[in-house]
């Protein structure tokens, strides 16, 4: 059973990281579009929001893949995702927006699992903790 747990934890981290990496890289490719989208939501400082989103998504995605500071990274990504859901998918009269909102909330739930239980044994965190003992 331990082999299955190990594989599931690593797979879950990789799948979650892929979501953030793809989103962050996509933002790099279309700065004007993303800044316009941020501005259209009525948020201040679209350029700053754009840069923060890239740092959080790409940086957080990479850190999730390698399993470094996973609990902290998961909490940051969870807060970021919750904020994005509230800012961008809050038009519940539109069924599509409601679906996006609840998908984001489900992602937050998955990230909270990483925050609570850590990255699993195939991670830099596990290696670092094993070396410390």
Predicted features by range, described:
Residues 1-29, 39, 47-55, 59, ...:
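Extended, low-polarity transmembrane helix blocks
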């Amino acid at each position: 059973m331990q082999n299955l747990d190990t594989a599931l934890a690593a797979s879950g981290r990789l799948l979650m990281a892929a979501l953030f990496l793809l989103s962050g890289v996509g933002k790099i490719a279309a700065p004007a579009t993303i800044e316009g989208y941020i501005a259209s939501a009525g948020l201040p400082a679209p350029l700053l929001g754009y840069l923060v989103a890239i740092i959080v998504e790409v940086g957080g995605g990479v850190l999730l893949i390698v399993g470094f500071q996973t609990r902290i990274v998961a909490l940051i990504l969870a807060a970021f995702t919750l904020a994005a859901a509230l800012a961008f998918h809050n038009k519940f009269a539109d069924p599509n927006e409601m679906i996006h909102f609840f998908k984001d909330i489900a992602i937050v739930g998955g990230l909270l699992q990483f925050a609570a239980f850590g990255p699993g044994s195939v991670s830099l965190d596990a290696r670092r903790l094993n070396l410390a003992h």
